[in-house]
């Protein structure tokens, strides 16, 4: 089981309640998890960055939101999920 930060979980809830198609993904090499949204000709990849700890498990350390053709924004853990979701929707609706 992978532990994720509250902000990531809240963004996933917004996505699930939206009209957007999405795909969940995991990277078994480094423990990262994410969700990919593809809407028309635009895409957003939201990655929950993980850091390994001594017992071999991972802890969440931040979010990376990649906007296709519009750059990447990286956030430390503990941000505002509602604001992040509004940024994502604004990008997808432009």
Feature map (PLM): residue ranges:
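Residue-level detector of alpha-helical secondary structure
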Residues: 9, 13-16, 82, 86-89, ...
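Intrinsically disordered, low-complexity regulatory segments enriched in Ser/Thr/Pro
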Residues: 42-83
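Negatively charged, low-complexity tracts enriched in Asp/Glu with abundant Ser/Thr
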Residues: 1-39, 68-74
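General N-terminal targeting signals
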Residues: 21, 52, 91-92
């Amino acid at each position: 089981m992978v532990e994720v930060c509250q902000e990531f979980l809240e963004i996933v809830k917004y996505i699930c309640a939206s009209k957007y198609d999405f795909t969940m993904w995991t990277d078994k090499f480094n423990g990262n998890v994410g969700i990919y949204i593809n809407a028309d000709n635009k895409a957003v990849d939201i990655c929950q960055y993980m850091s390994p700890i001594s017992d071999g498990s991972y802890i969440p350390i931040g979010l990376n939101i990649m906007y296709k053709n519009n750059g990447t924004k990286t956030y430390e853990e503990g941000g505002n999920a509602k604001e992040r979701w509004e940024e994502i929707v604004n990008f997808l609706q432009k």
